[in-house]
Amino acid sequence: VKLNVEGLKEIRKMNPAMTSYNVEMTEVTGGTFWKAYTPEQIAGKEEVPPPDFSQGNPVLSMLEWIDPIDSKNPKLIKLAKAIAPGLWVRVSGGWATKTYYDFDGEGQAPEGYQNRLTKEQWINILDFVKAVDGKLLISMANCDGLHKHDEPWNPSQAEKIFALSKEHGVPVQAVEFTNEPNMLYAVVDGYTAADFRRDQDLFHKWLSENYPEVIKVGPCTCDPEPMRSYIEETGQEETSGGGGVADVFPSCSTKELLEGCTEKIDIFSYHYYNGVSERMKAMSPTMFMPASEATSEKYLAMAANCANAYVPYRDKYSTKGELWVTESGDAGAGGHTWGSTYLEVHRTLNEFGCFATITPGVIFHNTLASSDYGYLQHGTFDPRPSYFATVLWNQLMGETVYDSGE
């Protein structure tokens, strides 16, 4: 490809924090996360076992226990800081929705919570964010331990984590009310979209009164329908809806989550994955694409399709004109077997470039150092190819986006 450098038209300046990342709450507290592939599975010499339905919930067979991350590790801090200064660090994920903030040392979480976050664990993460020159985005606890579906959300837990973060000198600078609320069954028992709208409005009112400087991000949607509709409208070949695990399980629509809300969000956020990984292939074969497709136009087009699909939602429901992809990865359910190899570099760099031409905003790679889609290998923190690609992107590409005419 030969570019006419003199004739390039500037589109925009990108958010300098575009290449941000996630630290899962389960990494902070210790808990279950997607089971790592074996070296033989990564090399294609061993089949990934299908989900075990005998346990009732087949997802349980795809998970393994991970101990709390050593966020003080010098190697982790050095590598995370090298990605770029001033990035967002998102601490969220499915576990965050049911995490009790045990900052008073009670020793156990009340009934209705799944796990607990100690004061020491949270301070360690705050110190990590400070050490890497980062900015903190979190999502809130919203589960049966806090309130029932027919009871309004209350700020008892939010007050704890916002106060401690501010007191420690690493304030929460942006927040999503609930991680992936489309999957209502994973929030509060009996929860509805109307309950979510009620509670997000209550939270945003509380935020405006107590922490008006904090950016309201949401709805953190993982809805597959917008991308499917966009693909149909543009006459493309049908693919996954981009929602990852949400493509497999029941979910409500983004419109249901936001239509009727009285408090407008500042920045619209969504999650994007190129379908599901080998772990979940048996549950939804049509949402899986093999390694042979990893450099295909169809596979690489998914990031741009997802961003384009959400531009109208950004314009309708938010005020600041940015899209934030608060989880992004090669595949839902922990990433593909090739997510930790050089084959993933194509998707990573392609996503950065396509996204930048479509909208200003931020992409939060999932994850920094957990499971097979992590920039760094869990435990050892050894960098993977997509990590080096992202570091080089930030060193070489700059913040100006041009229309190449291609």
Identify the meaning behind each predicted range.
Residues 301-306:
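N-terminal topogenic module of multi-pass integral membrane proteins
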Residues 1-177, 181-251, 255, 259-266, ...:
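Non-catalytic accessory regions flanking glycosidase/transglycosidase catalytic cores in CAZymes
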